């Protein structure tokens, strides 16, 4: 991007994708996602009211970039609404949810799959990026979302959080 970078806030490499977040001299945030083949950027104004990206959807790989960029913006935009996107696999049973937390590869999805296999009525609510929300009455609920993990699961549903298991 042509925007001057003022300060690097975060730089992570995961699954061959580098994500770098910078402050710009115009007090905006610049998010840069890079693979070996391509780099795309997104610029967010200081109030999170306007987001611009250079993704043109003119290459098959652009879906990956736009999906990641939207996921990141969504995760920040929901915070003022008492919501948090987390990394977990969620098993639902009779309206109650168990959230299995941990880093990638620790068995969250496997644990959820075993619940579905051995506990009658257990279902998968989300397998990677569920949304936690503190409701006005103080109840904590978990919601499915458009992002899932190793098991495709895109449910527009929610359940009462009974336990967080790490």
Where are these regions (language model features)?
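Conserved lysine of the Walker
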Residues: 108
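Hydrophobic positions on the alpha1 helix immediately C-terminal to the Walker A/P-loop
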Residues: 111
